[in-house]
Amino acid sequence: MGNFDIAAMQNIQKELQEKYKDGWGGLSPEKARNQLLWLYSELGEVGDVIKKSGDDKIMNDSDTRRHFIEEMCDVMMYFNDVLLCYDISPEEFEKIYLEKHQTNLNRW
């Protein structure tokens, strides 16, 4: 696998959303709120893996590590859904992300 970036993730999410649009309701600003709530839920699952398994198992136990990464993937999927709901392109996201990075570099 080569470069896996925001554009690739958004394309994957568009495919998934298109497949299930009748049941999930598609992507729109009105749906963003629900996607964000699902993202929070998935973040809680990431936290549960950390709390219940600990750092050492995440780093050294392949099953725990896989479970942790799967939950992080769920977070990223919902994150990308929110971007898509608000029609935020990879280029727009990258521009603002890099600007924010520069701000943070010069903050303290």
Predicted regions and their residues:
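Flexible "arm" and connector segments at domain edges
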Residues: 1-108
